[in-house]
Swiss-Prot record:
GO terms, biological process: protein transport
Span of the signal peptide: none
Protein name per Swiss-Prot or TrEMBL: Conserved oligomeric Golgi complex subunit 4
Assembly description: Component of the conserved oligomeric Golgi complex which is composed of eight different subunits and is required for normal Golgi morphology and localization.
Organism whose genome encodes this protein: Dictyostelium discoideum
Amino acid sequence: MDELIVDFNNLDSNLSIDDAKKYLQNLISRDKAIEINLKQHIKLKDDLEIQMESFDNEIPEYLTLSLKKSNELNNRISSTCQLAENLSSKVKKLDNIRERIKDTLKKVDDIIDLKNCIEGVQISIEKEDYEGAAFHINRYLSIDKSVLEDNSSEKLSIAEKKLLSMIESKYQQSLQDNDQKQVLRFCILYVPLEKPLEGIDKYCNYLKNQSKKLDAMITHYRNYIQSPKTIKPISAVSVITKIFEHFAAIIEDDLPIIKSEFGVLHCPHFILNITQQCDYYSSKVYDSFNDQFQTNKNVNDILVYKQQLEKSQQSIQDSGSGSGGGGGKVSEKIDPRNFAQFLDETSMISKATKFYEKYLIRKEHLIKSDIYQYYSKLEKEKIEKLNSIKSLIITNSRNQQLQQLPQPQQLQQQQQYQQQLQTQENKENELLKKLTQEKDKQMKQTIYSNVTKQKMNQLLGNYILLEEYFMVESVNKAIQMDSLQSLDFENNINSSNSNSSSVSGSGIGGSNTLSSSNSQQSQQSTDNTMIDFIFFVLQKSLQRAIDSHSIQTLNVICNRLCRILSQTRDNLKRIFREYIIRSSSKSVMDYQSSLQVLNNLETSSEYIIRLKKEFDSKCLKIYPIYKLDEKSKDLESSSTSSTSIEQQQQQQQQQQQQQQQQQQQQQQQQQQQEQQQENEFESNLKDDIIIIRNLLNLELKKKQENDRDQVNILSNEFLNCSKSFNKILQEEIESLFKSVQPRLKNVLNQFTLVNYEINQLEYDNNDINDPFVLQFTLEISHFFKPFQEHLSNTNYDYLVHQTIQFILKKIEGITIQQKKFTLLGGLQFGKDLRAISTYFTKISQSTIRDKFSKLNQISSFLILESISEVEDHWNENRNSPTWKLSSSEVQKILMTRIDFNHDQILKLKFN
């Protein structure tokens, strides 16, 4: 079309005829095209007009039909809603009528039951059918009080009292006959009479009568305390153990009966009653035990003695500072051996008490687990009932929303029904809350009596005080006896030295007479006895603390024991220093006493390690290692899967069918949710029961793990104490060696006088007449002799190493700074080093090769034939990890070779 359009403004005035014809033809084609388009539009207009006329005729008919259908549907829906409202109101009326009928029938049944109860009780009492009479009384107690008449209530109350009187009479008769079966029968009758605790008390009273045989045993024990020579011996340990075994057997045998006949909720009352009976007998034993050993008197005397001792020490300190007078009077010490038996038996009594307590804890966990399960079932029932009430509330509220303009009477009825449901829901919520509170209360309370535990703790408090006194005084007594015997020993030594000739020389002790040798053996035996006695006492005390099975007692005793060991270590250190000072002030130095102190330090360290091993092995049995199970902390919770509702029907176009389908879906979803909630609750109930059991076990395991941690801490204390003894031992050996270092001056002087600027003749002569090594070994042997005689092997070896290190250090300095060597002198120096090393290797228990490494390296440079070999030798060895010489030291060593040119030495490059 665009091609047919001609712009006349662009036509040229000089247009040719052919071009004009061409343009004319284009105009004709354009007109034809426009005419065709015009005809098409006219035809389209006609079609539209025809369609519009058709719509004007048909649309009103369709609209009228749709309006009619809509009105019919509206009428149907309205009638359906009205019918639903009427039906709902009638159903509610029927529900109310049904409830009233139920109440009426219940009252009728109660009246009939009341009549039967009155007749049945009288007949059962006449026949002495106590179980039947109790059943009728139980039924009477459960009847609604509103149907009871005064006359009927009075008759049944009289019958109840009469029945209780008869049961009491029969119970007393069975008690006298010691017939457990009949006693249990009449005690169980209190359960239907709604007096289960009274029944349990009566049964426990019977068990108490069965325990009277324990009175005879306690009487025997008391008589033995008063007349130990004429009465058959019996200990408090055996008495208390039999008491615990007796009552544990009662719990083990009768608890299942109480659980099945009286209910699990009354098991705690039974346990409490039995443990109170046990407390009665155990308290008698504890009191008699204290009377037997006069515990209170000993404790008071020790406290008074400690107070007087502190005042006396304070007075002495004040007197020393010039601010007070002399020390006050201190009462006589109590011999710790007087209550050694008390300590032994207290430990065993504590062990028996701990076993009894652990047994009660295990029973408590089992009972609480059953109680938790019982309350969980009740909670489940309450929750199910509460869910049903909530479902009714939701349904009623939905029906109210679907109703259109309900009548006032119907609206009022619906509101009343809704209020009833709300009231019932609140009531059930209160009951559920109360039930949960009762469960929590039952789970938190302790179901057994703690009097026995309290009595034992009081006894352990006295035990700890007496045990501390026993350890301290026994150790002090051993040290005092050792001091007295040491003074006697020194007097003997002085007297023997005055009768013997003193020998001068480089030795320490000089020559010893036979009497002095005997005195030395006596002193060594005395010191060993002191250490043995101290650790025997500490071992005994530690053993008692472990056997008590009380981690608190063990903790206190171990801490006190470690303090005593620390004091013993400090005393040994002080004594050693005093001996060193005394020995240094004498003309002939005698280190025997100080050497024995060093041996005592070593022996003490070994004893402590032995105590630690014994402590670890025994505590591992009593306080085993527990690893907390992660499954007990995080339990797998079972999850219930819910299947979605498959929609099988196709969606309908009509609104009524859609509403029906939605209602069906909502009902199905509600049922499915209720089923899912029930499954979840059952699963959660099982999980909760597992959880509460695991939590109780977890609590016990945590306590045991804490006890184990305390044991590990105490074990480390022993290890640290042993290390402190070893540290002091090394320090004092080093101190001892420093005090005797001047005695090695002659040995070092011999090396200073040795000439290493020798020729071949002198070198060969040295093989025949050794100028240094032989005399050196003799002097060293003489130096070591008293130490070897009196020191232990370990201490002696440590002193040897100290001596070797000192001598070699001095030889190293003399070699570099004072000596001059020829090649043969260097070879001689190497031979001397090997001879000295061989000698020291023989007298030493551990390797000494590393101590000679630097001197051997010095010797390796002294035997080089020429300076040209130095750099090669240096490069071969300088990267070795054991190489100890620096380049400057190597130059100094080479300078000692008289045959080497100093300028050439200085030109050496040590890269």
